[in-house]
Amino acid sequence: MSELRGSWDEQQQSMAYLPDADMDTVAASTSLPDPAGDFDRNVPRICGVCGDRATGFHFNAMTCEGCKGFFRRSMKRKAMFTCPFNGDCKITKDNRRHCQACRLKRCVDIGMMKEFILTDEEVQRKREMILKRKEEEALKESLKPKLSEEQQKVIDTLLEAHHKTFDTTYSDFNKFRPPVRSKFSSRMATHSSSVVSQDFSSEDSNDVFGSDAFAAFPEPMEPQMFSNLDLSEESDESPSMNIELPHLPMLPHLADLVSYSIQKVIGFAKMIPGFRDLTAEDQIALLKSSAIEVIMLRSNQSFTMEDMSWTCGSNDFKYKVSDVTQAGHSMDLLEPLVKFQVGLKKLNLHEEEHVLLMAICILSPDRPGVQDTSLVESIQDRLSDILQTYIRCRHPPPGSRLLYAKMIQKLADLRSLNEEHSKQYRCLSFQPEHSMQLTPLVLEVFGNEIS
């Protein structure tokens, strides 16, 4: 009996932490959960005493509420009943009040035990435990960070901006110069592609060209936005810039794709709360420096880890590493790019986190050419605060663990990718037969990059 009482006390303590428990009902009933889930929820449960609809296990037996209460009252009063008939009455829902003796006998026969009935002290203790639990839950909820109405509005604005500048059908790709894939170049790039897809378990990588796929329908690019801007810089003559590049059959198509993506990045940036408060010169400086990084971020939506490619609709617009090599880029960019894409994909970001990360990337006060760094920093800090609050409120563990730090690390990785892209772009653009394939927008945005 002591073992039974001990196990019962343990059960009472665990039951006190069941959420949304009705205090009086739980305290009085001492109902048990269905053993091992043996009962199908869709099958009606029958009271073992009277045949009425059962509500669960009460005092170690499946009974209805009426028989549960009858047994509890009888045991507490130590009632002694006598059957007025032959002591073998059949108890039903309709006649269960007629013979209390046979009803109580039936309760005992199906396994109901008085040891499962709480004493008055236990009832009080249970009520106190339930009340304490509710108070703890209320305190926990009150201390939980919440997105303010203003913060939610910023997120909604960024989501709308992304949806307006991201065409998931990729229908505009048909307007680009068609992709031309050289079989010879493809064979040359096959080894490179296989190397890239081998061991990307924990690192991240990301691609400019895959990203263009995400750009969608915002407002058309305004060429004058980038005109008359003097961001001249000395040309870093490096050995790679003197390399003679072969025929690049994919360059025209991917140049159009990147140009299209730049337009979408501009459309997205113009809708970031606070961006239009900056001077036109600072807006241009931020866009020119961050465009390729945001394109890489956007491209993650179409990136597929199964074959390390960017799938943008039909097979014509499925881009592999070999396609990008046929546009003039080498594995010095593509290998870390794919690693970046894999790492970013594994973070399983919510769309809200993704758009906030893009906005934070654009609003970086340390971009070259930015004049009002204080204003840019204040806008970025606001976006960072919203991102951290969102993660605490809306991103459940374990995915939320160190998520903000991991996202910020992705921005650092993008800087390295940006620098390598600049080097390879210069090498490409210095050869007239290749630079003539680029669009005016690409030439304007990447032409004066500061690496």
From Swiss-Prot:
Zn(2+) 2 binds at residues 83, 89, 99, 102. A zinc finger (NR C4-type) spans 47-67, 83-107. Residues 270-288 are annotated as: Interaction with coactivator LXXLL motif. One of its GO terms (molecular function) is nuclear receptor activity. Keywords: Cytoplasm, DNA-binding, Metal-binding, Nucleus, Receptor, Transcription, Transcription regulation, Zinc, Zinc-finger. Transmembrane segments: none annotated. Composed of three domains: a modulating N-terminal domain, a DNA-binding domain and a C-terminal ligand-binding domain. The 9aaTAD motif is a transactivation domain present in a large number of yeast and animal transcription factors. This is Vitamin D3 receptor. It comes from Gallus gallus.
